[in-house]
Amino acid sequence: MNDYLIKAINASKDLRLLTINGKDLVAEAQKRHDTWSASSAVLGRSLLGTLLLAGAELKGDQELTLRLLGDGPVGAAVVTAKSDLTVKGYVQNNHVALPAREDGHIDVKKAVGKGWLQVTKDLGLKQPYTGEVPIVSGEIAEDLTYYLAKSEQIPSAVGLSVFVNPNDTIGAAGGFLLQALPGASEELLQETEDRIKALPQLSSAFLDGMTPEDLAKKILGDDSKILEKDEVSYHCDCSKEKYAGMLETLKGSQLKEMIDEDHGAELVCNFCGNKYNFTEAELQAILDKKLGK
C-alpha cells in the first residue's frame, strides 16, 4: 500500500489527526491530465485536501466536492472524493508553469489567485450542503483551515505539499489535517502548534521517505495511537452509460443537430480524460427513447 491515509489520536484523546501519502494518486492525475508544474501543484494539493476532508467527515455512500474558484492562471479546480477514499479532479488550465519563488518553490498562491473556496457535501439527504469562504491565501492548506474554522467552526490546521520534478513528474505528495476535539486545552493547542511550526518542509520530508506514521508522531508525540489505516486512490467512475444518461437530458433539437450535422458525438470526461463516442444510431436511439418511440 503506497498511498494511504491514517487516522490517529493523541494520548489524552483531545486531538485528532489525519495524515496522507498520495504520491501515486497525484502522479496518476498528472499523467491523465498532462499537467505542468503549477497546475500539478494546485491539482495535487486539492486532491490531498479533499481526501483529508473526506476521511474526517464522510461515511456510508457520502461524497464531497471541493471547488477552488480562483482568478489565477490555473483557473478553477474541481475535486470529488467519496467515503471509500477514492478521488478524482481536474483544473481548468492544465498547462501552467510559473517562475519559482525566491525559495525555489512553485508559486501556488499566484497560480490560484483570489476568489472563493466551496465545499459541497452530499450526505444522502434531500439537498447537498455547500459552504463557501473567500480564498484567503491561495496556498490551499491555509484556505481549508480557514474554511473549517468559519464554515464548520472546527479549530483545525492543514498542511499540504506536492513536489514536482523538473520533468513534470511527481516526486512526493502528502499532508495532514489536525482537529481539536472538545476538552483540548489552550496549552496543548499551543504546544501542538509549536510542533507543527518545527516540522521540516513537508515535500522534502516526504521525498526523504517520511511516512504518514512518522508525521503523526512528529505532530502528536510518540504516545499517539493510530486508529485506522486506509488505502487512497485516484478513481473516476465515469461510464458510457452515465454519459448516455446525460445526453438524454438534452433537448430533442440538440440531439437532432448532433445527428444531422455532426453525425455522432464524442464526449470527454473532465475528471479522467476518457472519451466516449456515440454513433448516429446510438444518438437516434436516445432521441427515440426521449420522444417515447
Swiss-Prot record:
Disulphide bridges: C236-C238, C269-C272
Organism the protein comes from: Lactobacillus delbrueckii subsp. bulgaricus (strain ATCC BAA-365 / Lb-18)
Main subcellular location: cytoplasm
Keywords in alphabetical order: Chaperone, Cytoplasm, Disulfide bond, Redox-active center, Zinc
Protein name per UniProt: 33 kDa chaperonin
Post-translational modification, as annotated: Under oxidizing conditions two disulfide bonds are formed involving the reactive cysteines. Under reducing conditions zinc is bound to the reactive cysteines and the protein is inactive.
GO molecular function terms listed in the Swiss-Prot or TrEMBL record: protein folding chaperone; unfolded protein binding
GO cellular component labels: cytoplasm
Its job: Redox regulated molecular chaperone. Protects both thermally unfolding and oxidatively damaged proteins from irreversible aggregation. Plays an important role in the bacterial defense system toward oxidative stress.
Family in the record: Belongs to the HSP33 family.
